[in-house]
Curated annotation (Swiss-Prot):
Belongs to the eIF-3 subunit E family. Residues 219-392 form the PCI domain. Component of the eukaryotic translation initiation factor 3 (eIF-3) complex, which is involved in protein synthesis of a specialized repertoire of mRNAs and, together with other initiation factors, stimulates binding of mRNA and methionyl-tRNAi to the 40S ribosome. The eIF-3 complex specifically targets and initiates translation of a subset of mRNAs involved in cell proliferation. One of its GO terms (biological process) is formation of cytoplasmic translation initiation complex. SMART domains: eIF3_N, PINT. It is found in: Cytoplasm. Its main location: cytoplasm. Component of the eukaryotic translation initiation factor 3 (eIF-3) complex. The eIF-3 complex interacts with pix. Interacts with mxt. This is Eukaryotic translation initiation factor 3 subunit E.
Amino acid sequence: MAQFDLTRINCQYLDRHLTFPLLEFLCGKEIYNQQDLLEYILDTVNKTNMIDYTMDTRKRLNLSQDMPDELVQRKSDVLATLKQLQNEVAPIMKATDILKNGESMKDSKTFVNALQKDYNFKVEHLESAYKLAKYLYECGNYQESTSYLYFCLIVMSPNDKNYLNVLWGKLAAEILTLNWNTALEDLTRLRDYIDSANFSTIQALQQRTWLIHWSVLVFFNHPKGRDLIIEMFLYKPLYLNAIQTMCPHIMRYLATAVVINRTRRNALKDLIKVIQQESYTYRDPITEFLECLYVNFDFEGARLKLHECQTVILNDFFIVACLNEFVEDARLMIFETFCRIHQCITISMLADKLNMKPNEAECWIVNLIRNARLNAKIDSKLGHVVMGTQPLSPYQQLVEKIDSLSMRSEHLAGLIERKSKQKNQESADSWKYY
């Protein structure tokens, strides 16, 4: 199903190193030609200092017998450069060890003063630490790189020319080492920096677009990610605007998060509005499944789209782990919507809508009623399911109103900020003529 594969477009917004897991994942699928994929990986890895990975990829392409001398020499050069950078950072190595062991001081200024007093710390050392962190990252030594990147974050001023690069590098390294808790902290820190920085409109849009793509990797691997992705992508106007303007394909991941998050069903109404608005720029089986079910009430169409959704998710690196959960929750959505309309239905009819056998459907419904505490009854003799009324709980109503008010407040705050900037700019321009 290459027509629905987003790897090519997603990789445009990811760091080179973050693309490798996606490309290796595709190698295990039969979407693209294996030879072409490996050649693309080789071309990409050649732009890094991961020489062993380059050699391994050449072996997979049956090019190991013709290992070029310059590659062997390049490995030697990389090791020599790494040694040189480590020597430059040697005076503050003990300080980074302290940070590794979690003994860092909370106050950045106090820590810098201690460095200057105990380790004769100079500005040149910070530049060396930054270069070493970047070089370690390029070599694929992400774990060690995070130590120096953390050191840079503690010591650097947010006004430093390399501060933003360090934020991005730290997030990438934590993602690649699968440290999801720390990655979420770094993601939040980077988002706050981008939202408060004095970027131009275009620069801010570009930064947010990149952050959106990187954050998908974090959100679908962190326990709290399913709530956070909805809050950030759907209820933060600046990020929703970035999705609608630059990357509507991200709707796939937002829609998936809403489907598998039973506690955020209140977000469905807002999601459907956005899907309808963006349907002319982006559609896939996941967004079409929701349209069929909640806009057109086309249950046959929803059933067919759910089958396509399984293939799409199975071949998408970001959400493949959600496959079983998605199918289960999508069936629940079909069940709830169908019963809400018809109130009394036959089990055989419901089994057809859910792509299940009648006896499987009956067991599924029994477990659903028991576990989810749905107000429904099964008449086994007649083969009927009778739904009771499902009033919206006060808690759900409150959450829905809070989300709506939060979104409107952020939108108004954004308008006020833009008008204020425009007014200040006009005021500044008027002084040019005096």
